[in-house]
């Protein structure tokens, strides 16, 4: 069953944040990320949400720990404010 790591945070500059994200400093694929989706709030484009899909909870927890370490680094502190993580179990998804 798929496990999702939901990440929510405010970024100081979306374009700068996206450039760093695209360099993949944490090795998403190697860490077990199967798929991800990036979303922004319509009325606050500095608020970013991501869903990262993993095969299991252990991989999601390990990646969450890597994210926390990145956020406390100097680079992370310049780009990300008020980070929140949730590990969730998708119950149902349908295309209509």
Go through each PLM region and give its residues:
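Short, low-complexity N-terminal intrinsically disordered segments enriched in polar/charged residues
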Residues: 1-3, 94-95
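Short, well-ordered beta-strand segments in beta-rich or mixed alpha/beta enzyme
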Residues: 3-10, 37-67
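Short amphipathic alpha-helical segments
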Residues: 13-36, 68-72
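Residue-level signal for secondary-structure boundary sites
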Residues: 15-17, 58-60, 93
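Glycine-rich beta-strand-turn "strand-cap" elements at beta-sheet edges
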Residues: 31-49, 72-96
